[in-house]
Amino acid sequence: MAAAELISADTVTTSTHGAVAPAWHTALVLFVLLGFSVLGARLQHLTAHGRSPDYLAVIAMEWVLVAFIWFGLGRRGIPMRDLVGGSWPHLAAFFRDLGIAVAFVLLVGGAVLNGLGYLLKATPPKAMQELFPHTLIEMILWVVMSWTAGFCEEVIFRGYFSRQFAAWTKSAIAGIVLQGIVFGLAHGYQGWKLMSLIAFYGMCFGMLAHWRRSLRPGMLAHGLQDTAGGLLARFLMH
């Protein structure tokens, strides 16, 4: 996943792929994502009635958005499996991607982001602690929400937006950077410091997908990261 490899493959990758959906479709997806950010801001202040309804709302919204992307892909005759890429014809292929995912979470999610977070003095708002699960039902729903995000957000950002922006700019690198920025903006309710870290993390996920020509390792990494982050935070708070 060296930078030289990414640069050398830049024009080659984008020359073989056109836009994956109409421009109006992408504009509408971007508009809907603003709702995710608004919902996130709302969730920070909702605790009295429990978190389960809000987790379910996020799960539903993400699947609806992926369904809309699937609709847009269909208008261009692009199967969802082409956007996801890769395959698991045998267990060895799955465990290979799982190993890559674990290494990515530990090295990039752990070492790099923690280092940058320390330099930026980026800390989550206290209200965000209320987003983490407290009860058994909430923990189960958190896991479901985490793996929903692992699949859906990788399809949305590293699949759909990355391919779309790369086609428009004729550059895979630009596609990776732009989708990372949108990923950060979708988490804008966390403050500009954390938003910047999330945008950078999104770009790292984009490079991983570009390197592997598949969203699968990123999906596994994303699901693992979100699951572990929420459950660990829940136990550390008690």
Predicted segments, located by residue:
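N-terminal, membrane-interfacial amphipathic/helix-forming hydrophobic leader that caps
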Residues: 1-92, 118, 230-238
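Hydrophobic alpha-helical transmembrane segments
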Residues: 27, 55-56, 94-99, 139-143, ...
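Aromatic-anchored segments of alpha-helical transmembrane domains
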Residues: 32-42, 105-111, 180-188, 226-232
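Juxtamembrane helix-loop-helix connectors linking adjacent transmembrane helices
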Residues: 45-55, 80-149, 167
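Membrane-interface helix/loop boundary segments of multi-pass membrane proteins
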Residues: 152-178, 207-214
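Small-polar-interrupted transmembrane alpha-helices in polytopic inner-membrane proteins
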Residues: 172-187, 202, 223
